[in-house]
């Protein structure tokens, strides 16, 4: 399985004239991975700063947060859902000014000596919602503290000592993960505030919903666009020579990012307020279109591509299982195309056995694009051709249907490695005893990992203790139970990456979530929100 190069296809623009003129090809880099490499000189600088300026900066930043706490406490007293008085009382204006000054001093102490601001922030009556992108770090809180705008936060955040008080001051929209109706209530609250004619503070939302490495803009969630009111796009840049800012799912952990950032002589950040985007009538009726068109405007300002990767792809990339997906896996692209065809992985899981039986009956017989379309019960389209090309390694216009089923199984249940392998054995196994040879195992694992080349000889020989030249699922399962880290020992050291990211190393241990300012969130990975193994 490989990601064959295909140029960007033309996509129809919306009738409003604001749609994407072209759907750009997927980025070469996985947007959920960040690799940080320090030169010898940079390592020496970090060592020097760790012993000198780092502890001073850390203590001073903590002191400034403590200094801000009593002001925020007094100003946040009272019912949180009560409409702010208009105009603001003089004492609240003073508190607001003091808190902004304290927060700016805190960032200055952390090395953010100059925060470049371009454009003009719109008034609340002009744009009640500010959409910020790309979302790449907890340092994205800088524009929040500079404007004291409201944000969307998890309800649990208000119980954090000191930080919770500071959060309550900006009157955030709290999302409760224990309330099944939370998403609807959140959107309704955003809509209520957005339509208050400037009575509430502006709401800052990161529509990507998770952190990326800023190489592209992933799919925007529609929560900020459902109210159908004008929004002001805001783009963030960190033009530093060494990127110690980015905090993604795979890469340096939160504490390491903080340490390395505070060990830089100075850190730069640029905040650009773009012109207010007023939705057309069509966009008001279609929040997804509205979100897509705003993303296009922001991507153009940033000079980056857009991709249809989503927050759910992040879950796929970081799913815990015995087969860890490499950073350059093609399965993210496969998952994107599955959704592009209108197929939902969560609904397809129950049909995997039916798909696998149909593929097994083919016994490796190759099929062409029209047959593939009939198998999926979808018309031939650009998205289907792109998906077909993922499995057409030779470029001969034919694919093995079994590979599609294996890839689909990984996307539908990314954490259930053995279930996918068992399904593959049923399709590839001999009719007599269900055994497979080394070539079959290589094909199964390459597809399950979404890569084009993989050496499985050592793994196959380790499983095939009797040297029969064939193994069964029971053999594989028994070996996996005895050596749960078999992939680390037998696959990844010799893994050759696909053409799409030839120089990308194996992905390190995943991080947890960045602070999510988007109204739509997931429970995935919360148990690992602070876990990091270096």
UniProtKB/Swiss-Prot annotation:
GO annotation, biological process: negative regulation of phosphatidylcholine biosynthetic process; phosphatidylcholine acyl-chain remodeling; phosphatidylcholine biosynthetic process; phospholipid biosynthetic process; positive regulation of protein catabolic process; protein catabolic process; retina development in camera-type eye; surfactant homeostasis
Stretches the record annotates as Disordered: 1-25
Pathway assignment: Lipid metabolism; phospholipid metabolism
Keyword Acyltransferase: yes
Locus of motif HXXXXD motif: 135-140
Species this protein is from: Rattus norvegicus (Rat)
Keyword set includes ATP-binding: no
Protein known as: Lysophosphatidylcholine acyltransferase 1
Catalytic activities: a 1-acyl-sn-glycero-3-phosphocholine + an acyl-CoA = a 1,2-diacyl-sn-glycero-3-phosphocholine + CoA; a 1-O-alkyl-sn-glycero-3-phosphocholine + acetyl-CoA = a 1-O-alkyl-2-acetyl-sn-glycero-3-phosphocholine + CoA; a 1-acyl-sn-glycero-3-phosphate + an acyl-CoA = a 1,2-diacyl-sn-glycero-3-phosphate + CoA; a 1-O-(1Z-alkenyl)-sn-glycero-3-phosphocholine + an acyl-CoA = a 1-O-(1Z-alkenyl)-2-acyl-sn-glycero-3-phosphocholine + CoA
Topology in membrane: Single-pass type II membrane protein
Lumenal side: 79-534
Extent of Low complexity compositional bias: 8-19
Sequence motif Di-lysine motif, location on chain: 531-534
Annotated control of activity: Activity is stimulated by Mg(2+) or Mn(2+).
């Amino acid at each position: 399985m490989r990601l064959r190069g295909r140029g960007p296809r033309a996509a129809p623009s919306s009738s409003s004239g604001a749609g994407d003129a072209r759907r750009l090809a997927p980025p070469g880099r996985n947007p959920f991975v960040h690799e940080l490499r320090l030169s010898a000189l940079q390592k020496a600088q970090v060592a020097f700063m760790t012993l000198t300026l780092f502890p001073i900066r850390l203590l001073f930043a903590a002191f400034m947060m403590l200094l801000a706490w009593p002001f925020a406490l007094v100003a946040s007293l009272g019912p949180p859902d009560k409409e702010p008085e208009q105009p603001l009382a003089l004492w609240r204006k003073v508190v607001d000014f003091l808190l902004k000054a304290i927060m700016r001093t805190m960032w200055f102490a952390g090395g953010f000596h100059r925060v470049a601001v371009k454009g003009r922030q719109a008034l609340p009556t002009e744009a009640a919602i500010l959409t910020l992108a790309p979302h790449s770090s907890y340092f994205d809180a800088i524009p929040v503290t500079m404007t004291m705008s409201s944000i969307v936060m998890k309800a649990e955040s208000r119980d954090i000592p000191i930080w919770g008080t500071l959060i309550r001051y900006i009157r955030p929209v709290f999302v409760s993960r224990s309330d099944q109706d939370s998403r609807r209530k959140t959107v309704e609250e955003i809509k209520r505030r957005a339509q208050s004619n400037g009575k509430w503070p502006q709401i800052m939302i990161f529509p990507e919903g998770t952190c990326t490495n800023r190489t592209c803009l992933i799919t925007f969630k529609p929560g900020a666009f459902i109210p159908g009111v004008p929004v002001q796009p805001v783009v963030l840049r960190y033009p530093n020579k060494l990127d110690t800012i980015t905090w993604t799912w795979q890469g340096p952990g939160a504490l390491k990012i903080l340490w390395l950032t505070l060990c830089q002589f100075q850190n730069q950040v640029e905040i650009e307020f773009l012109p207010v985007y007023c939705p057309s009538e069509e966009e008001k009726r279609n929040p997804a279109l509205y979100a897509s068109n705003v993303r296009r405007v922001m991507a153009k300002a940033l000079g980056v591509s857009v991709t249809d990767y989503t927050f759910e792809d992040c879950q796929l990339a970081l799913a815990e299982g015995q087969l860890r997906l490499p950073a350059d896996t093609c399965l993210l692209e496969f998952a994107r195309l599955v959704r592009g065809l209108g197929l939902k992985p969560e609904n397809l899981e129950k049909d995997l056995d039916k798909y696998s039986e149909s593929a097994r009956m083919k016994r490796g017989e190759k099929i062409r694009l029209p047959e593939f379309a009939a198998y999926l019960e979808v018309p031939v389209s650009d998205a289907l051709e792109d998906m077909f090309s993922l499995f057409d390694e030779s470029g001969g216009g034919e694919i093995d249907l079994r590979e599609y089923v294996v890839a689909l199984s990984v996307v539908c249940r990314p954490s259930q490695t053995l279930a996918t392998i068992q399904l593959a054995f049923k399709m590839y196994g001999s009719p007599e005893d269900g055994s497979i040879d080394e070539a079959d195992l290589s094909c199964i694992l390459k597809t399950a990992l979404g890569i084009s080349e993989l050496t499985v000889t050592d793994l196959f020989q380790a499983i095939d203790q009797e040297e029969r030249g064939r193994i069964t699922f029971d053999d594989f399962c028994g070996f996996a139970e005895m050596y749960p880290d078999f992939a680390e020992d037998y696959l990844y050291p010799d893994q050759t990456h696909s053409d799409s990211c030839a120089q990308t190393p194996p992905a390190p241990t995943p991080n947890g979530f960045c602070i999510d300012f988007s109204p739509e969130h997931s429970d995935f990975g919360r148990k690992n929100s602070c876990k990091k193994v270096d």
